[in-house]
Regions:
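Short coil/turn segments at helix-helix junctions and helix-capping linkers
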Residues: 517-523
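Primarily the internal scaffold of c-type cytochrome electron-transfer domains
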Residues: 26-32, 36-39, 46, 54-123, ...
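Bacterial N-terminal signal peptides that target proteins for export
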Residues: 1-13
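Core register positions within helices of long alpha-helical scaffolds
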Residues: 492-495, 530-533, 601, 609
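Alpha-helical solenoid scaffolds in eukaryotic proteins
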Residues: 469-475, 507-514
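C-terminal motif of bacterial Sec signal peptides marking the signal peptidase cleavage site
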Residues: 21-23
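A gly/proline- and charged-residue-enriched helix-loop-helix capping module
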Residues: 159-162, 173-179
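Eukaryotic intrinsically disordered, low-complexity regulatory tails and linkers enriched
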Residues: 586-615
């Protein structure tokens, strides 16, 4: 995806550069790395650390700082131990040769060995890139397996996206120079060679790419620092040329700082694409993002051919983003922004708190919202009609539900709005209430909301997916939804906040077991995780060990055996423990066995569209 525009002008005076080096004790840049540049006013985080040691240290522990790295024993997370990873007839064998990290590949009938030159990611999974020379340029290409940090195992790259099973390892190829470079680094300059030729990117383009810094560093958010560093010890103390501080900007410019990456976008006007792929995006912190790019919305036309629905599929039917990297679009569509002064730093802190969420440590739980909504904060239970210390009184659970897919997990929506059962059901969007009350239907949610908050809440006329209205919303999404809806439901069923009546305790496990046979590996992975979580959290049926043995990447025949074996084990355990009889709408018979005929009818309703994430 992209970013964009100019802000701080460089002052290319050697004298000032010398002053800066002596004034701040600047250490030599690591320009020994041929990927690094010092153009357009960028100086690198080492120059910032000389004066801002605390801020540098707090940034260095974030996942922003380790987003892109060179391979080393300290930075590589994957086990390059010589074990083979296979999919179909293809295979990859990661191994080490001294300080080098390599993969022996057999892909599409071609055998070769690739050396890892770049790493992308360090939190949920880590991807690996090789360098290939193309005539007078070079490009970095993604290798076909990645290391999943939580699972502690190798996975085919295409298995973590929203797509069906692949026959081999050749899918989801990506070129770093046209994609990852733009957001996962500081001061990207893709360096497209021959840019005066017809400006259409195609396989075989040559690049001489550089970045100011690998990873997302100080100047990504504060702007190029050359003038600031050069004047840091000016005669009149405190008169150093200022860098940008996002929390001091007006709201439009403040959200743009994060939106340059957390807001999927297109160059605007389109002819600016050539500039993007030569000298890099034009946006600089402190500017308005929309002066440089067009953020992608549900109705944005797809340029240059391709699937005309590609962008629309990245949103729920009401326009709410359902993929990561669209947080900007969610924020600017929220009334907290349009009618208030919400910015990213209202809730997030880049130099404080847990690096995993980077939430402000001075605001705990609902304080993120009650810092503005003070009246509600005085009596939360009166507003929520739930116990004040329960999940039903969580502002985030209701107004920023987990309905966004990305990096092999589900995340919170950044479109802050009110739950609406009619809107959600008719738009195919998972409903906040039934993400906790996983055994309840949308009409049930509408009745409760109408009782508590007025007649404006109603049940949907029909569901977007065509499933019966009286079916639990989670089950309908899990079986009849498209891949994004199924992934959201699979995660919701395993959340600590998920509640269900005793007559659904067996059904929830059975639903997840069936979903472990889903045709899309990313959905199977999440269903497996949730079933194990339910077994740990709720009185165990004793099927956790059996579920643990099911490999979500096994072949279709083996998966079928595993799933039916797991369903048999669930039914037998329920009978042995005299579990409560399943509810009539739970898709189970009195013998605790799944009503497969009804489930198959629901799966026939599934949307089969490929939801292209663009990575």
């Amino acid at each position: 995806m992209r970013a964009s525009s100019p802000f701080l002008t460089a002052v290319p005076l050697a004298l000032l550069a010398l002053v800066a080096a002596s004034a701040c004790g600047g250490e030599p840049d690591a320009v020994a790395d041929p990927l690094l540049h010092r153009e357009a006013g960028y100086v690198g985080s080492a120059a910032c650390r000389a004066c801002h040691e605390d801020q540098h240290a707090s940034w260095a522990v974030t996942h922003h700082s380790t987003m892109t790295q060179r391979p080393s024993a300290a930075t590589v997370l994957g086990h390059f131990d010589g074990a083979t990873v296979a999919q179909g007839k293809d295979s990859a064998r990661p191994f080490r040769d001294g300080e080098r990290f390599l993969m022996e590949l057999q892909v599409g009938g071609v055998a070769r060995t690739a050396e890892v030159e770049l790493l992308v990611g360090s939190r949920r999974y880590q991807q690996y890139f090789e360098r290939r020379t193309l005539r007078d340029g070079a490009s970095f290409f993604r290798l076909p397996i990645l290391w999943h940090v939580e699972l502690h195992r190798w996975l085919p790259v295409d298995s973590v996206f929203l797509g069906p099973d692949a026959d081999g390892l050749g899918g989801h190829a990506a070129e770093w120079n046209t994609n990852c470079i733009l957001c996962h680094n500081t001061g990207p300059r893709p360096g497209l060679l021959g840019a005066d030729e017809p400006a259409r990117l195609q396989e075989g383009n040559r690049f001489d790419s550089h970045v100011a810094e690998l990873g997302i560093a100080c100047e990504s958010c504060h702007g190029p620092g050359e003038r600031h560093v050069a004047t840091a010890r000016s005669v009149a103390k405190g008169e150093a040329h200022a860098v940008v501080h996002p929390d001091e900007l007006d709201k439009e410019r403040a959200v743009a700082v994060c939106g340059q990456c957390h807001g999927a976008r297109l160059p605007e006007p389109p002819r600016r694409a050539r500039e993007w792929f030569t000298t890099g995006p034009t946006f600089r912190p402190g500017e308005k993002l929309v002066d440089h790019v067009k953020p992608i919305e549900r109705g944005t036309p797809v340029r240059g051919g391709g699937d005309p629905e590609a962008f629309a599929l990245r949103f729920w039917g009401d326009g709410t983003p359902r993929l990561t990297a669209y947080e900007y679009q969610g924020v600017v569509a929220s009334q907290c922004y349009t009618k208030g002064e919400l910015t990213c730093t209202s809730c997030h802190a880049m130099h404080d708190g847990d690096p995993k969420g980077q939430l402000r440590p001075d605001l705990v739980g609902n304080q993120l919202c009650t810092q503005c909504h003070e009246d509600i904060g005085k009596d939360v239970a009166a507003h929520t009609r739930h116990a004040v210390d329960g999940a039903g009184s969580s502002c985030l659970a209701c107004h920023m539900p987990k309905v966004v897919f990305g990096v092999a997990d589900i995340h919170r929506s950044h479109r802050i709005d009110n739950p609406d059962p009619a809107r959600d059901g008719e738009a195919g969007r998972p409903h906040a209430c039934t993400l906790c009350h996983v055994d309840k239907s949308l009409p049930w949610a509408a009745d409760a909301m109408r009782r508590w908050w007025g007649e404006r809440y109603r049940a949907p006329q029909q569901r977007f997916d065509g499933a019966p209205l009286d079916l639990a919303d989670a089950a309908a999404n899990l079986f009849a939804g498209d891949a994004a809806a199924r992934a959201v439901a699979a995660v919701a069923l395993g959340e600590p906040t998920a509640t269900f009546a005793p007559d659904h305790a067996v059904a929830v496990r059975a639903w997840l077991a069936v979903t472990m046979g889903d045709g899309w590996p990313s959905v199977r992975l999440l269903a497996r995780r949730s079933l194990l979580a339910v077994e740990q959290r709720v009185g165990a049926l004793g099927v956790g060990a059996r579920a643990q043995t099911v490999d979500h990447l096994a072949g279709v025949e083996q998966r079928g055996k595993d799933v039916f074996g797991l369903l048999d084990a669930i039914a037998a355990a329920a009978r042995d423990r005299s579990a409560p009889a399943p509810a009539s709408i739970a898709l189970l018979g009195r013998d605790y066995r799944v009503d497969l005929a009804r489930v198959v009818k629901l799966t026939d309703l599934q949307g089969r569209n490929l939801i292209a994430i663009g990575e």
